[in-house]
Amino acid sequence: MENPSSNLEKLQQDCYNEWMSLQAKRITELKEAISTGEKDDNKLLDLIRTAIRDFGDYARKRSEHSRRFSSNYFAPTWNTCLENALLWMGGCRPSSFIRLVYAMCGSQTEHRLTNFFNNTNHDIDSNLSMALGETRGGIGGGESMSDLTAEQLFKINELHLKTVEAENKLTKVSASLQEDTADTPIAVAAFYKEVIGQADVVVERALDKHEEDMGGLLVEADKLRMTTLTKIVDILTAVQAADFLLAGKKLHLAMHEWGKSREHRRLEASGGDSGGNVTRE
């Protein structure tokens, strides 16, 4: 007879694999729209709305799959160790979306200024246009993020403060749930049981309740991620939003690949002794 827990974990992992494949597909679509100098805001907006809807669908599926076994999402076996070390409530911190905006803005501004001062083969008007962000076609490639206005930066900073505050509230709830495991009945039962880990109906009920509460926390965290993502996109122009989403998806997939590479190097360095870790695909 198959283990229901194993079946559910497979569903969770399949859901994740589908999500990662979808990210790769959206990257291709966004890059194509940006690289071809697509000036049709409606087309870009359709891609942006699709990307937002993708995350909403993924969060809904995660919620359904976490009702009985939510702990799988807080240290997923399908993630690399690097990714799990960076997890916050089963995913990335919503405030990291905003940090990505700041990083892209700063990087592209520096890039343009460097081009302005180093590009001595062009006349001053050409250099000035480049520094001001007047790129050919006025489209993406990351350059659009250096065109953020003072009003946009103010709104993003305001959103950053509110997001961090919301994160802190959820972190406090998580800390409280973790502390509950060192309280009655779990800790007391562990102390008095002659056989360590011996089955206990009361403990199982308490752990089921803990898992249920953690599942609720995951849902709230995903809601905050969704809200933050949507508000950032609302602040940005269509081109900026496309650049931002492209950067976020590339970072997500890159962290997974970097994590696998690091684990592979460690495995080789240890002479093939994985220390009990499962080889990740």
UniProtKB/Swiss-Prot annotation:
Region of interest (Disordered), ranges: 262-281
GO BP, sorted A to Z: DNA-templated transcription
TM region positions: none
One Pfam assignment: DOG1
Observed effect of gene inactivation: No germination phenotype.
GO molecular function: sequence-specific DNA binding
Residue span(s) of domain DOG1: 9-265
Protein's recorded name: Protein DOG1-like 1
Annotated organism of origin: Arabidopsis thaliana (Mouse-ear cress)
